[in-house]
Design a protein with these regions (language model features):
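Domain-level signature for proteins that mediate thiol-based redox and metal-cofactor handling
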Residues: 1-110
Length: 110
């Protein structure tokens, strides 16, 4: 596949990813995590996606942080053409634990 087609494919995947992310609503605030600008980075390479995100507050309830991170991973994983989705949570007192638990949890059916 040539460089232009790869770039177009990545841009299409990026749009699909952000479409899925925009469906995820912060349970405390009731606003999309995309609108809240909680997504810090989306890297796509060889069917793998790394997503870095932060939460609205360093001390928001950990269950909400886990729910958001889990929804991010599960929603994005279902996109055709992606093999692996890795999440990294920051700016939260339990960021490392949430990141570890989400990345080690069972993946949804495709």
């Amino acid at each position: 596949m040539n460089r232009i087609n790869m770039s177009q494919e990545i841009q299409q995947l990026r749009r699909l990813i952000f479409d899925e992310l925009s469906k995820i609503v912060d349970p405390e605030i009731g606003v999309s995590i995309v609108e809240l600008e909680l997504i810090d980075k989306v890297d796509i390479k060889d069917g793998n996606v790394d997503i870095d995100l932060h939460l609205t507050s360093p001390f928001c309830p950990a269950i909400f942080g886990f729910k958001i991170a889990q929804d991010v991973r599960d929603n994005v994983y279902k996109i055709h053409g992606l093999d692996k989705v890795k999440i990294k949570v920051s700016n939260h007192f339990m960021a490392d634990a949430i990141t570890k638990q989400v990345n080690e949890s069972k993946l949804p059916e495709k």
